[in-house]
Amino acid sequence: LKGIEMEKGGMKTDVLEDVLKSSSGQKLIYVIPNFQNPTGDTMSAEKRKAVYELACKYDAVILEDNPYGKLRFAGEEVESIKSLDTQGRVLYSGTFSKILAPGLRVGYIAGPREIIQKIIVCKQVSDVHTNIWAQLLCYRFMTECDMEKHYAGLREIYRKKCSLMLDNMDKYFSAKVTYTKPEGGLFIWATLPDGSNMMDFCTKAVRDYKIAVVPGTAFMINES
């Protein structure tokens, strides 16, 4: 498992190419292109095209995970990597847990049949099948409710929450702290000044102010 450095608009494609070039065997590129967890950043159209071209060049498969795509409350939608796929090397996945209820652990995946068949076997080994009642709830919701109206309501809820959070960060945070301003999704990534101790910060936040902050090291391959 190799982490790829991030920058505004997505992963650094030159670093990705170096990793792909030096890797042998089967290669899988995992991306969350929209409102990525944990940065809240969205991969640009140019980055998506570059990642797909690198996958083609080095015979890699892309897993495009899009759990937050329907939660865009600002800006313009960016076409999926899957929409660029002419070689059958992109798997596209999503979930109902972010748009219906967190407890509904129901997801979906689209991709080449030969890969999907292998995924089905792995899924069956893992838990036989997804909870039938959860699947039925999702089915009934999709077929009997106005999904677009539901999405619009969710977007407004998260727009207000994000705006409130950013307004307070603008008001109370030091100018030395930088942070992302997402156009959707659930996440904001804050960067403390050089020399700060992240674990001390998180401990003090929860102990003194009852605010839980997830340290960035939790999302790093090398915990740097």
Residues covered by each model-derived region:
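PLP-dependent class I/II
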Residues: 1-224
